Amino acid sequence: MSWQTILAIGSGGFIGAVLRAYFNGIISHKMPHDIPFGTLGVNLVGSFIMGILIAYFMYSTIFSLHVKSFLSTGVLGALTTYSTFAIESFLLLNSGHIALALANISLNAFGSILMAGGGFYIIKLSLRA
């Protein structure tokens, strides 16, 4: 990976992280707190934008590798890693790999929740010791 690509991803990541915090704060402030609507909002919007970008990247040659890296891995990767999960799952479905897509969806959803809980409880138990 070239230093230009690394710089593109890093600067895009900075922008995406700031956007995530900003929009998450606005949405969370205005919506009820029973469901984390801020996170849901950035995940849904980020996934939609990722779909748009991937279509442009696949069917157009107007974007350089650095612009692609900046927008997809950088901005959207920091805005929401959910957009990557969404487009990878969609591409599996779109290519007819239904079982792989369902496995990917299940493993990501349930595996991430289990790992988050596992990490939480490891620290919780270690702080009690």
From Swiss-Prot:
GO terms for cellular component: plasma membrane. It catalyses: fluoride(in) = fluoride(out). Na(+) binds at G77, T80. The chain crosses the membrane at residues 6-26, 35-55, 73-93, 98-118. InterPro entries: FluC (IPR003691). It is a multi-pass membrane protein. PANTHER family: FLUORIDE EXPORT PROTEIN 1-RELATED. This is Fluoride-specific ion channel FluC. It comes from Sulfurimonas denitrificans (strain ATCC 33889 / DSM 1251) (Thiomicrospira denitrificans (strain ATCC 33889 / DSM 1251)). The gene is fluC.
